[in-house]
Amino acid sequence: MSIQDVKNYLPHRYPFLLIDRVLELEIGKSIVALKNVTFNEPQFTGHFPEQPIMPGVMIVEALAQATGILAFKSEAGKPIDGQIYMLVGIDKVRFKRMVEPGDQLRLEVEVITIKRGIWKFKCKATVDNQIITSAELMCTQRTAG
């Protein structure tokens, strides 16, 4: 899935669109996406100027955006249909390594459960096959606006 396709499934735009490409997607089960980290991103002007590292919350947000694409594709919807997926919970977050400009984040998400409209996902972000961040995320669908 190209960036143009990604933009059809996420309402986010620059500088907060954190998915560059989807490599794999299995409806209702899993997604693998990429985020290319570059020095030109605005967070690096303050985090930290002498040693730029991607904030952990931005890594979690990238994972959350991957969950949104998976949920939209699984439910055959899009944000233009008046619906959005909102992050409603984060559990078991661990940060193991730093992410620096030039890294490519591989975002891997699997559906754990779907109960009463709440999706629960097992997520991990890796760089060069090393785990950077792991977490369980929850999201639900809401009407936009």
From Swiss-Prot:
GO biological process terms on file: fatty acid biosynthetic process; lipid A biosynthetic process
Family membership: Belongs to the thioester dehydratase family. FabZ subfamily.
Source organism of the structure: Ruthia magnifica subsp. Calyptogena magnifica
Role according to the record: Involved in unsaturated fatty acids biosynthesis. Catalyzes the dehydration of short chain beta-hydroxyacyl-ACPs and long chain saturated and unsaturated beta-hydroxyacyl-ACPs.
Enzyme category, top tier: lyase
Gene name as annotated: fabZ
PANTHER family linked to this entry: 3-HYDROXYACYL-[ACYL-CARRIER-PROTEIN] DEHYDRATASE
Protein name from the UniProt record: 3-hydroxyacyl-[acyl-carrier-protein] dehydratase FabZ
Subcellular location, principal: cytoplasm
Subcellular location: Cytoplasm
Organism superkingdom: Bacteria
